[in-house]
Amino acid sequence: PGHLKPADVTARALTGDPQAMRSVDLFCAIFGAIAGDLVLIQGAWDGVFLTGGLVPRMLESLQHSGFRQRFEHKGRFSSIMGRVPSLAVIHPNPGLLGAAAYAVDAECATAGAAA
């Protein structure tokens, strides 16, 4: 049917279109593999936060796809990777939450230093 926008592929997958479902599953698997690679590269053993506009829209697909399998399947590191959490951030403004938390922490540190 020509070129589809990513949102169209996702929408078609939700309606059960087999080709769109395969595309979304493949995307989720690749996303998991890359996220797992980044854990290994960065040593992010405490976990990975999945953010961005596509995460809330694809949350169910991420949960039921090969995301975790590909995230964890890292050869001799597989058992360690199985203990690394991957968390989806679904808040619409996570940057503002982070900035507010940073400001509160900075204020508390300043107040504590002055005491």
At which residue positions do the language-model features occur?
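ATP-binding/phosphotransfer module of carbohydrate and carboxylate kinases, centering on a glycine-rich
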Residues: P1-A115
